[in-house]
């Protein structure tokens, strides 16, 4: 079949203070979160260009905008997604392909399940909507960006974080 929608949603963390971070911790996060974005998109972009249609949605993170102590590798990988998204959007717009990013805040996932109750409460207390997000919150905006309703939106980042980062 023809691929017209690509969602790049890779993400791992290997948190450590930079002075203690190993090259392996740095490289594993950059390779998974950023280099995979390049590799997967490159596999599908030619087909989308030929078909003159497509939606590419890159999942970043609120940490890509705000930074976070102990996450220089993760925040670097996620902030680079914004430049990739904007540059690619300019490259492929003439072929009716949109490229956008979504920056989730703290979402209930396997990654956030590893946090202690105290850590979760500290995070929730900093979120104006006073709750963590759900996978459905991210799915809803992803469906919108993949739809014809978003055909005039490209090169953008949509924050879905309950007001944590404004």
Give the residues covered by each predicted segment:
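Active-site helix of classical SDR
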Residues: 41, 77, 85
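Substrate-binding pocket helix/loop in short-chain dehydrogenase/reductase
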Residues: 17-18, 25-30, 112, 123
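Residue(s) in the substrate-gating loop at a strand-loop-helix junction
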Residues: 61
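C-terminal helical subdomain
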Residues: 101, 124-149, 153, 160-162
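Active-site loop immediately N-terminal to the catalytic Tyr-X3-Lys motif
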Residues: 19, 66-72, 94-95, 130, ...
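Alpha-helical segment proximal to the catalytic Tyr-Lys
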Residues: 46, 90-94, 151
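Active-site loop-to-helix junction immediately N-terminal to the catalytic Tyr of the SDR YXXXK motif
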Residues: 21, 67-75, 87, 115
């Amino acid at each position: 079949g023809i691929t017209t929608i690509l969602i790049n949603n890779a993400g791992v963390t290997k948190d450590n203070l930079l002075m203690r971070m190993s090259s392996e911790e740095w490289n594993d996060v950059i390779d998974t979160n950023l280099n995979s974005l390049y590799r997967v998109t490159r596999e599908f972009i030619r087909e989308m260009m030929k078909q003159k249609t497509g939606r590419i949605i890159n999942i970043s993170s609120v940490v890509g905008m705000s930074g976070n102590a102990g996450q220089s590798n993760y925040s670097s990988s996620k902030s680079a997604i914004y430049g990739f998204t904007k540059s690619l959007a300019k490259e492929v717009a003439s072929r009716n392909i949109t490229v956008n990013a979504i920056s989730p805040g703290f979402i209930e996932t396997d990654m956030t399940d590893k946090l202690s109750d105290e850590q979760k409460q500290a995070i929730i207390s900093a979120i104006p909507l006073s709750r963590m997000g759900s996978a459905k919150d991210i799915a809803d905006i992803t469906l919108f960006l993949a739809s014809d309703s978003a055909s005039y939106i490209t090169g953008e980042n949509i924050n879905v974080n309950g007001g944590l980062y404004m």
